[in-house]
UniProtKB/Swiss-Prot annotation:
Membrane topology: Multi-pass membrane protein
Localization (cell): Cell inner membrane
The keyword Cell inner membrane appears for this protein: yes
Quaternary data: Forms a complex with SecF. Part of the essential Sec protein translocation apparatus which comprises SecA, SecYEG and auxiliary proteins SecDF-YajC and YidC.
Biological process (GO), any one: protein targeting
Gene: secD
Organism whose genome encodes this protein: Acetobacter pasteurianus (strain NBRC 105184 / IFO 3283-01)
Official protein name in the record: Protein translocase subunit SecD
Key words of the record: Cell inner membrane, Cell membrane, Membrane, Protein transport, Translocation, Transmembrane, Transmembrane helix, Transport
Keyword Protein transport set for record: yes
């Protein structure tokens, strides 16, 4: 026990405790104090109130879009290879693109040519000659699943960028299952703007308009009738399916006021790839209409007056300030790979959150008070030392959560309460071991030394096992499970510190001052 008499060790342990207390203070202050690090615990949805959105990724739309792209690539490849075809069909139910060769003798050549098409993932599709003579490109089930996983992961990142752009504080965005995303928005009781932002795919393309007036009624293959975003501007336009410039090549977008009209507009700029493509199409199609299509609706279709080579442009579509800002935000964040739909929405009022906070603090306070009384009644002075260690444990837990600006939820508060129980177990084990050594007739110093040594290995083993288990919960869990696991994991670390260092040091310093003939246990 003499090694714990060191003033340096005493100062180190007390310094950690004082630092923890300092980090806790901002949680009880409304305004920053210059000499105190200003980091606070953020309250989760169940404590602060706010909105909960459960959104589903439309994976069928994702597959359909890929089939449409595959059909377009098939058409272009056959034309370039001078291979005739009839009726390219897309069957989303069977995940196939099929066509009838113009000449049955060219079927094998068709298969060999189309088999060289680029694949997004390995073995994405196979090219087969059917019994009826048609050629079919079939998406594989594994490729569809891989694309779905990638789409959900990509959607989460884009959702996060869009929400961050609105200034929302502490949003929580997690995956649920194979095709769902949970969005928690603390402090936002009316998430209508967020829903509108997330419900828009924001897939922008730039395509030429077919100038043949007959095609406005009967569009040929490769041309689609695309409705106007503003129906007052006219009926659907015949737009070529071929995408001349893709919105993924955008590098920036912002809401501006048009200097000529005084109306709100969205300015944009392309990267080098988009700049070259935009320059090429505007140079070779002067006098033609160029449609800006957002989510399969034409925002506007201006006539190309002169080549645009600078890689910058502007979209005007009768926007107000909010719509222009939101569109620019969505373009900066990127297009969603597939549409999102809200399948569940809940709102938690701030009064309910305040009730949860009061209930959580009350449970922690009552639990801590009962522990204090129990330890003092059963272990006397050493019980008081255990209570001091428990208080320091709670302070250090709050300090670490504040340092990392973690989000505290009701399950997290339950984890803190459970941690106090685990810390009590450790202190009880130490005191019982000391009692056993006293009963065997050992001197006070020997009883304390041996009692701690016998208890330490058990405490470390049990806490190490619990630590690993809760780390796994944090890594693989979601939502409330992660909050619970986080506080338990932090609590285990602080429990080992306060139990094996602080409480032992308090006992050792007391013994060094008093040299008692017997121990108060």
């Amino acid at each position: 026990m003499r090694m714990y008499y060191s003033r340096l060790k005493l100062a180190s342990v007390l310094g950690v405790c004082l630092l923890g207390l300092l980090l806790c203070l901002p949680n009880g202050m409304r305004k920053p104090f210059p000499s105190i690090p200003w980091r606070q615990i953020h309250l989760g949805l169940d404590l602060r109130g706010g909105s909960y959105l459960l959104m589903q990724v439309d994976l069928k739309s994702l597959t359909h879009d890929r089939l449409q792209t595959l059909a377009e690539n098939t058409r272009d490849t056959l034309l370039k290879s001078q291979l005739g075809y009839q009726n390219i069909n897309v069957d989303a139910d069977k995940n196939t693109v099929s066509f009838q060769p113009r000449d049955a003798a060219e079927a094998d050549t068709d298969v060999a040519t189309l088999d060289k098409l680029p694949r997004v993932v390995p073995n994405e599709f196979s090219v087969k000659k059917q019994d009826d003579g048609t050629i079919a490109l079939v998406l594989s089930a594994d490729a569809i699943k891989a694309r779905a996983r990638e789409a959900v992961t990509q959607s989460i990142e884009i959702v996060r960028r869009r929400i961050d752009g609105t200034g929302a504080v502490d949003p929580e965005i997690t995956r649920q299952g194979d095709d769902r995303i949970v969005v928690e928005l603390p402090g936002i009781s009316d998430p209508e703007r967020i829903k509108a932002l997330l419900g828009t795919t924001a897939k922008m393309t730039f395509r030429l308009v077919d100038s043949n007036p007959l095609h406005a009624t009967y569009p040929p293959p490769g041309v689609s009738l695309v409705p106007m975003a503003n129906p007052a501007e006219g009926g659907p336009l015949p737009v070529f399916d071929h995408v001349d410039v893709d919105g993924t090549d955008l590098t920036n977008a912002g809401a501006v006021i048009d200097q000529q009209t005084g109306e709100w507009a969205v300015s944009f700029s392309f990267d080098s790839v988009g700049t070259r493509a935009f320059s090429s199409v505007t140079q070779t199609n002067v006098g033609k209409r160029f449609a800006i299509v957002l989510d399969n609706k034409v925002i506007e279709a201006p006539v190309i007056r002169t080549p645009i080579t600078g890689g910058n442009g502007q979209i005007t579509g009768g926007f107000d300030a909010q719509k222009a800002t939101d569109l620019a935000l969505m373009l900066r964040a990127g297009a969603l790979p597939a549409p999102l739909s809200v399948v569940e929405q809940r709102s938690i009022g701030p009064s309910l959150g305040a009730d949860s906070i009061r209930a959580g603090i009350l449970s922690l306070g009552v639990g801590f008070l009962l522990v204090v009384v129990f330890m003092v009644l059963f272990y006397g002075r050493f019980g008081w030392y255990a209570d001091i260690a428990l208080l320091a444990n709670l302070v250090l837990m709050v300090a670490i959560l504040s340092l990392f600006e973690a989000t505290l939820t009701l399950p997290g508060m339950a984890g803190m309460l459970l941690t106090l129980g685990m810390a009590v177990d450790a202190n009880i084990l130490i005191n019982e071991r000391i009692r056993e050594e006293v009963a065997r007739g050992r001197t006070p110093l020997a009883a304390m030394q041996t009692g701690f040594e016998r208890a330490t290995s058990t405490i470390v083993d049990s806490n190490a096992t619990a630590f690993l288990a809760h780390v796994m919960l944090f890594v693989f869990g979601t939502g409330p499970v992660r909050g619970f696991a986080l506080t338990i994991t932090i609590g285990i670390a602080t429990t080992l510190f306060t139990t094996l260092l602080l409480s032992r040091m308090l006992m050792a310093r007391w013994y060094a001052r008093t040299r008692p003939a017997s121990l108060p246990v």
